[in-house]
Amino acid sequence: PVAPGRRGPAVGYYRPRSHDVLDVADCLLQPETVTALRLAFLGWMEDFHVPPYEETSRSGLIRHLYVRTNRAGEALCCVVANGSSLPHTHELVRRLRQLSPALAGVVLNQNTRDTNVILGPDYHTLWGRDFLEETLCGMTFRLSVPSFFQINRAQTSLYAQALDFAGLTGTETVLDLYCGIGTISLALAQRPPRSSARDRPQAIEDARANA
């Protein structure tokens, strides 16, 4: 989240049980690429006086900075804005690319609703790709901004073991509810039972592309 701070925009995490944003310069749980992108983004906001979103008055522009990474070290950066455009877009992209050569794309998400839901319905690619690729179970998956993928990637190694425990014969129909980008459905398809997946439209779009 992004919010007004004591010394300028705060880009970080919510304090426990509050809507107060704690400015966090680094986090041991995230790749160094994310830290570099945050630094470049914050500098752009400060230098060009881009206002953070203030949820009480519903004023300001920048609501969130959303970054995805993959095992290859690439990053996809999404700026969630209370509007349909950003000022000084070319300078933002230049700074992000300069501090993170592994940047694959920059996406603008428009969220003008009075809500605590992070992402709005509309996306616009400012530069590069609007997706990353990740390899799992010998398959390559496409990850776009809104689609779910296991945050703890090490856990995905359990997929093959879970499939073995299931003892599928190939005659079953398997329902994959809240399927995300279809990792489990497509892993099951190698066995091969019939599988049917359900999720939000953006995730299903990625799942179909992955299939």
Where on the chain are the PLM-derived regions?
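Rossmann-like S-adenosyl-L-methionine
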Residues: 88-211
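SAM-dependent transferase fold signal centered on methyltransferase-like domains
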Residues: 1-124, 136, 157-160, 167-171
